[in-house]
């Protein structure tokens, strides 16, 4: 797979709109560094999410623990692997985690994960005994990434942790030591939002009608259909204000609507929230993840059914006419994660494994993809550009 550096024009090739793609990785299957592929089932190594550290140029990828997945938190160096299908190495210091769905890097270069504390198949429970879900942070500024924070989420708050979706890290004092941090974790099974106050070592959950599925989503892949009914799944944070609060944008996995709530209300343990409905993105625009770019004021969405990445400028009203596509490709199958790094590079990920019963995959061509673009270039000439 060639890398298209500094692509100036938008080209159309075999139905794929390639807008300023700067980097692309594609895997037929996941190979772990130093581990014999015969010791695990490649069909069960299904990555779900990633994070890119712009300083070290490393990518961290999570692979939920399904029998017999050997490593749940992995990494590779993009300077050593600028393209292709790199093998994944074990993340240092990750021996005490069970299964992870997503990593997030904050402004202080801390890598956060939410360990669900259990495996999804009973045959693995003897090897990985069930424990409380936990929020864990690692310091990426130091060698071997030492663990610097660990908080076990009470079961009454976590609910069913196998329903953890996306989460956001809210550093309210990034220039003042990073000690005041809140974590917001979406639980799409329980239709709740979990809040963790790092400073007080406390957590609570919030429920609201907008966290529930709007409808049943029909996922179509190769003629097969699967019905999804997913509650709140993705969350991203806007710009920090003078009081240390931000707008939090969220969506349901089975919804085409977008909502906003101020983090000031999320931080109140016994408070009430009054979300603002921002609008409807249009039919077949259901997404699992979204990411805000402070530089362009644009939110990007991974639409899992349309196989595209869409955008919306937060300075505009939200409706079908204000949404545009920055990437659209038939090989971008089941987009599961998206983020903007500290260099304003947009990264988005598809794992090629839609949750369809008796899914038949062939491993003769890549189906797992990770793609990067510059945020400004990606929206040039689209409805998301504000001149």
UniProtKB/Swiss-Prot annotation:
UniProt cross-references to Pfam families, sorted A to Z: MRJP
InterPro entries, per the entry: 6-blade_b-propeller_TolB-like, Royal_jelly/protein_yellow
Chief location bin: secreted
UniProt keyword Repressor present: no
Record keywords, A-Z: Secreted, Signal
Signal peptide: 1-18
A Gene Ontology cellular-component term: extracellular region
Stored PANTHER family: PROTEIN YELLOW-LIKE PROTEIN (PTHR10009:SF18), PROTEIN YELLOW-RELATED (PTHR10009)
Function: Probably modulates blood feeding of sand flies on vertebrate species by binding and sequestering different mediators involved in the host response. Binds biogenic amines. Binds octopamine with high affinity. Binds serotonin and dopamine with medium affinity. Poorly binds histamine. Does not bind noradrenaline and adrenaline.
Protein name (database record): Yellow-related salivary protein ASP2
Species assigned in the record: Phlebotomus orientalis
